[in-house]
Protein backbone atom coordinates (compact mmCIF):
# COMPACT_ATOMS: atom_id res chain seq x y z
CA UNK A 1 0.00 0.00 0.00
CA UNK A 2 1.31 3.43 -0.94
CA UNK A 3 -1.56 5.66 0.12
CA UNK A 4 -4.46 5.99 2.53
CA UNK A 5 -4.63 6.12 6.36
CA UNK A 6 -3.45 2.51 6.52
CA UNK A 7 -0.16 3.29 4.76
CA UNK A 8 1.57 4.20 7.96
CA UNK A 9 0.07 1.29 9.73
CA UNK A 10 1.02 -1.29 7.09
CA UNK A 11 4.35 0.37 6.40
CA UNK A 12 3.87 0.03 2.66
Curated annotation (Swiss-Prot):
The keyword Electron transport applies. Binds 1 FAD per subunit. It comes from the Eukaryota. One of its GO terms (cellular component) is respiratory chain complex I. It is found in: Mitochondrion matrix. Its cofactor is FAD. Complex I is composed of 45 different subunits. This a component of the hydrophobic protein fraction. This is NADH dehydrogenase [ubiquinone] 1 alpha subcomplex subunit 10. It comes from Canis lupus familiaris (Dog).
